[in-house]
Amino acid sequence: MLLMCKNTPVYDIDNEKILNTNLLPGLMEQKGANNHTFTKWMKYRYSSGTNTMARKLKGITFGQGARMRINRETRALSFSDCYWIKATDDPIRFEEISPYYKPFWDGNEAFAGQAAPTLYVGGALSKAWKQDGKLYKYGDISVELQCIELCRKCGISVENADETDGGIAIYNITSPMLMLEQADQSGRLDPDDFDEQTIIELFGKAGAQMLIIDAVIGNGDRHAGNFGWLRNTDTGEYVSMAPLYDFDHALDSTLESDRLLTDAVKFCMPYKDEVRRIAGVAAEAENEVFKKRSQSILRLIECSF
C-alpha cells in the first residue's frame, strides 16, 4: 500500500519507506516516518465519535470498529487534504476518485467504493460534507455566524458560511492546490501540552490574531484540531496559517475578566498595535459579550504600560 498526495507517491506503507520527503504529513516528517507515526497521523484525520452524522454513515455500512476496512475501501480520501492510499499496482488516479472531482458517498445510496469524506471530519458537532462541496454543521450555531462576521470586520482570515435550516453550510477552505494540515497533525506541537506562546512562535501575527479574537468571543476550546496551516499540494510548502474555523465554543466565557483575556494580552504584547486594533473594532460589535470583553482587552493593554 502507498500513501499518495494527489498522484505523487509519498510513503510505502508496507516497507516503511519514504518516497517523497517534501510531501510527508508534518507529523511523519517531524517525528520520523514509520508505521507508528503513520497510524498516529491517520487517527487525527478520523471523525470524532461525537459527530452523529459520521457515526451513522460508518455504522450502516462498515460497523463501528472497522477503521482499517474503511481506509481500504474509501482509500482514506478526505475533503481537507489531498492524501489517500492505494495498492502499489493500482493504476487509478486522484482525479478519478477524489471528492474534489467526483461525486462521493453521502449515505443516500448504497456504498460502491466511493470516497466518504464525512468519515474524516473532526470536531464535536454533527457535520457532513454535501455534494455542493460545503460542510453542513447542525445544531445551535447562531453565534458561529457572529464570530465569522466579526473576524471579517477585523480583517482576519476566516471560513465563509451560509445559514441553512437547522445549521450552517461552510465553504471549503481547501482545494486541489491547497490542503489543510491541522496543528495536531503537524508534529510541531504537543496537542495535549501547548500554550499561547507556542502559537505565537509557530504563527506570529496570525497566531496573535487568533488568540485575541478567541479572547473576545470567549472561546475556551481552541484545541489543536481547530487551527493549522495551508500547504501547497505539489511542493508541500507551508503557505500560511489556515483561515480560522470552528467556533463551537464561543461564549464559553461571558465574563469581563478571566485568564483567557489576561493570557491573550500577555502573550500577544509583541503585536500590541494589532491587539489594540482588533479590540477596537470588536468593541463596536452588536454582541454585548464581545463588546465588554473587547473593552476589557483595551483596558489591559493600557495597564501594561
Regions found by a protein language model. Name each.
Residues 1-219, 224, 228-305:
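Phosphate/dinucleotide-binding and metal-coordinating scaffold of catalytic cores
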